[in-house]
Amino acid sequence: MASETEPRPLGTFECQLCALSAPYSYVGQKPPDTQAVVLLEESYIMKDPFSSDKARFLVLGSRCSVCSRLVCVGPDCSLFYSKRVCLPCVQENMSAFPQEIQQDVEKRKSTSKKHSNRP
């Protein structure tokens, strides 16, 4: 049974690429119960279920800055390069990213293919 001081979920975050689904308790850049934390993007946040420390939280995801899809922070769904960008938008705009980001995306694709080929 949840205590009265625990934040109640505002809704359910669902990644539009991988269908990750989790209850979120805050949306914004300044998570509750933190003093010096300001996130670089408006994020969907949940309290860390593995910690009793109220200041600990998990970032679930945010909106893609290009297409506004709701995407998780997982490496197969999005990357953060000054703003959150979903991987389909990264692919469409690959030349707009620095060489290091392009190489990272290529590595992610090859790693993802290796995992999907396993029985």
From Swiss-Prot:
InterPro entries referenced in this protein's UniProt entry, alphabetically: CDPF1, CDPF1_dom
Superkingdom of origin: Eukaryota
Pfam families attached to this UniProt entry: C6_DPF
Recorded family membership: Belongs to the CDPF1 family.
UniProt protein name: Cysteine-rich DPF motif domain-containing protein 1
Gene name of the encoded protein: Cdpf1
